[in-house]
């Protein structure tokens, strides 16, 4: 997408110098496999806002990154000396400064409703991370947890999208975790999750297919095999942040 | 305060009937000792918005409550058939429908900054709940955790309030947990936390004194001995939600 510059640029390490940011430009500090940062990528894509992406090593954090975000997490955006982080705060900030492309509805109740949906769907991320690390002792509880989260997601889907007829705020915020849930059977083949999504969640399955057709999702999504390779490297304590980057 | 009706009304149980809500009125479903519900109380008080309060038993949850909020948590507000929950969502909704008394600033960056402060100060609530339940095994780690959270809070306080010269959104959202941290030495005398706040955190100590002078805090705050009695009852699995209510 023409509005992204550097979405797949090489990840910067502590020894790398931070390129200067031109006045008026917006920069996104990103990690290519972080679902929270992906929320910001989806938002920039959906709003078609021009952005320069800096990919950051989150295990060995550059000093210049911690100076900008003391929590050391992604996403962070920088804009005329202003620093904004936390994925939901970044999304609202982008809507506030570019109101013409606001993803959040203007109506107070509909706005609140989108945020409540995100809260109710957040059980998916908890369940995903639980299963990612599940041991023989707790994998049964983890699978039950995921089923419960997906049951909720299935029941809350009453239209094409969580945003209604078109995709909205809740869709942008929940998608990155659903993308990873879909890949979980490949990341953890030992858990035998293959059929989990397909048969029990017809609405959610159709929703995932629908989401994959959205231009913003096409920008942000990573191939399943890259997710698998990333998590394999992550487990070793040395995540490979540059998986899938092809030499220029 | 004249705008509150029923802030200290008797807590309703599953067998109690829910009184009808008049059209145009706003109702807050509350639990008198819940810090998240207290955020909403502070917000209604600060904005001087008229509200009817229903106190709800959160151990034995009334069916009518779960129908309104499937998560069964407080605060929830009800307003002309609309249901809004999650404390931060409730606060923004109240600002959206009563913009003249908006607590959140209009400027996008200042808005974002208030929300980032809440995120950074949220370590206080985690540390508080950790110490509330601390055992001999983990109390040292719990105390270190609280100190770290308070160090951050001390360093982030660069003016009279987190909102700046006057109290703001971040103050309303962080206060309920600070109120409880101050009472922690009485709830858990075995942890010897008495001098924790007084000596190491001069800015925070002055801030707490300043907060207690605000009209909205005077409405929402509970006496230390009521917090202690509540937590003593909570530990038994039978929380006494009606501590401090005097017969009409």
What are these regions (language model features)?
Chain A
Residues 134, 189-197:
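Short helix/strand-bridging catalytic loops that position acidic/His residues to coordinate divalent metals
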Residues 1-166, 201, 236-238, 244-248:
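GST-like domain detector, emphasizing the conserved glutathione-binding G-site
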Residues 198-228:
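A contiguous, mid-protein "functional segment" used to position or interact
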Residues 155-165, 187-188, 214-221:
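Surface-exposed helix-capping loop/turn segments at secondary-structure junctions
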Residues 79, 174, 207:
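Short active-site alpha-helical segment characteristic of glycosyltransferases
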Residues 224-240:
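C-terminal/domain-terminus segments
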Residues 165-189, 200:
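GST superfamily/GST-like fold recognition
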Residues 95-99, 122, 158, 177-178, ...:
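Hydrophobic/aromatic-lined pockets within catalytic cores
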């Amino acid at each position: 997408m023409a509005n992204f510059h550097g979405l797949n640029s090489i990840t910067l390490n502590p020894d790398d110098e931070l390129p200067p940011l031109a006045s008026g430009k917006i920069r996104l500090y990103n990690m290519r496999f972080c679902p929270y940062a992906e929320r910001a990528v989806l938002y920039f894509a959906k709003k078609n806002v021009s952005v320069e992406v800096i990919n950051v090593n989150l295990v060995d954090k550059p000093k210049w990154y911690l100076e900008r975000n003391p929590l050391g997490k992604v996403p962070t955006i920088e804009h005329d000396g202003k620093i904004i982080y936390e994925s939901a705060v970044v999304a609202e900030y982008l809507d506030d400064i570019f109101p013409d492309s606001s993803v959040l509805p203007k109506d107070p109740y509909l706005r609140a409703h989108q945020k409540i949906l995100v809260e109710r769907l957040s059980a998916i991320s908890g369940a995903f991370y639980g299963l990612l690390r599940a041991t023989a002792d707790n994998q049964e509880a983890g699978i039950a947890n995921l089923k419960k989260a997906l049951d909720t997601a299935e029941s809350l889907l009453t239209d094409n999208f969580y945003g209604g007829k078109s995709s909205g705020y809740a869709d942008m915020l929940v998608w990155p975790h659903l993308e990873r849930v879909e890949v979980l059977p490949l990341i953890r083949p030992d858990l035998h999750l293959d059929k989990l999504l397909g048969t029990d969640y017809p609405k959610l399955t159709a929703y995932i297919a629908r989401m994959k057709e959205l231009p913003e999702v096409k920008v942000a999504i990573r191939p399943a095999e890259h997710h698998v390779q990333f998590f394999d490297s992550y487990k070793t304590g040395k995540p490979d942040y540059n998986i899938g980057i092809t030499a220029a």
